[in-house]
Amino acid sequence: MSKLGKKIGFIGTGQMGEAILRGFLAAELFQADDIYVMDILDSRLQYLKENFKITHLSSDKNKAYSYIVDNCDIVVLSIKPQVLKEVLEYIKDCNWNREKHMIISIIGGINTSFIEKYLPEIPVVRVIPNTPMLVNIGASGVAPGRSASKEHAKLVHGMFEALGVSYLVEEKHIDSITAISGCGPAYVYMMIEAMADGGVELGLPREMAQTLAAQTVMGGAKMVLNTDEHPGRLKDKVCSPGGSTIAGVRALEQGAFRGTIMKAIEAGKVRMEEVAKEEENNN
């Protein structure tokens, strides 16, 4: 039995679902026998069986949903927004019990209220995780729905805190969190790639340049997290008068580096809001 004394079922196991599943196993929150998975791809189920020793697996829509609800306390919705309505139509008539069950939704752009229309009495907690959970350095936002209690929210918050950092927030802040920590890893990867490309242009081997870039980003992040100093102050400490760093900073400012990053964060939030409206209009 898991540390939490509960069993968990995943409906869908894409990249993010796998990251969470892998993280829960690594943190020993659940054992393989505590985990149930429904995925439409048999190849995906075989992968989970071979790599994580999970045996409670099914791709049969007519049986798998009831199987998960009957056996699990926590049900994780890890599917595309486009198929959510179909899944909810399947699972709404399963044997749900408000005192036993809780739903965790990691579906981008879908508010808890949408799920609650189909399962009005079942606690729903929305979570926005990110892919660095694969290496236990994730960052998550956790927002309880209308039917979720403080205890439900605290439980989910603790589960995701085991995979990195987790913030318990009101749902109105979830899209903003998504724009930073959900989308942000892609921007960081782009920066690492660009730094490595710059090193290659200057004559460094690709592997060396990429490792130096990634290590530098990781080191800078740890400096921000482990000191009480503002990032701007830390930047100033690297910039010697008339030196190479301040010359590079000037080049970044000429390219509107900070403003562009802020625009990317804003664009991510706007797109999340658009997705929510699209799904609402379609349903």
Enumerate the predicted regions with their spans.
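Small-residue helix-packing motif on alpha-helices
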Residues: 35, 45, 68, 205-212, ...
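Rossmann-like NAD(P)(H) cofactor-binding subdomain of soluble oxidoreductases
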Residues: 52, 64-142
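Short acidic capping loops at alpha-helix termini that bridge into adjacent secondary structure
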Residues: 31-35, 98-100, 207
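Internal alpha-helical scaffold of NAD(P)-dependent oxidoreductase catalytic cores
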Residues: 114, 118-123, 139-177, 189-226, ...
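Conserved short alpha-helix immediately C-terminal to the canonical SAM/SAH-binding motif I
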Residues: 41-44, 83, 195
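NAD(P)+-binding Rossmann beta1-loop-alpha1 motif at the extreme N-terminus of oxidoreductases
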Residues: 1-70, 200-201
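NAD(P)-dependent Rossmann-like dehydrogenase/reductase catalytic/cofactor-binding core
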Residues: 2, 214-283
